[in-house]
Amino acid sequence: MKITAIELSIFELPTNTARFDLEEVAYGRRTRWQSRGHGRIDAPIHVLHVLTDAGIEGICTVGDARYQTMRREELEQLRIMAVGHDPFDRERLDAKLRFATRSMFSRPGWHGAFDNCLWDIAGQAAGLPVCQLLGRID
């Protein structure tokens, strides 16, 4: 099996976090800070898709608490370095992308969603949920 394409979908969704200001309010003999809302915001949600020649598509949202998007430069570099490779060779691809991180001036872990997509592909190919591929503690 080979990776044939890597795509990115971008959605604008309302976030759970609203913008706010803090104001001091009297609270007995003391004061305390109270938030005053400034409305909800929409945020981009990036979803990475890794397609294979076997028709299996690995899907994962991008990011964590530190970042929620994939830059165009990272997506293009990922395509150059991963398309045409075996999606089951996760360790080799991870080592290659970790080594490339310094030359790209990208944050460590920028390719984490790609790794999750590879696990999704492996799970679909095996007919198992990813949690069973990873194992569990009894």
Residue ranges and their predicted role:
Residues 1-59, 63:
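Structured beta-strand/loop patches that form or line metal/cofactor-binding pockets in enzymes
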Residues 51-125, 136:
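Metal- or metallocofactor-binding catalytic centers and their adjacent structured scaffolds
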Residues 40-41, 136-138:
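Solvent-exposed alpha-helices and their adjacent loops that cap or buttress functional pockets
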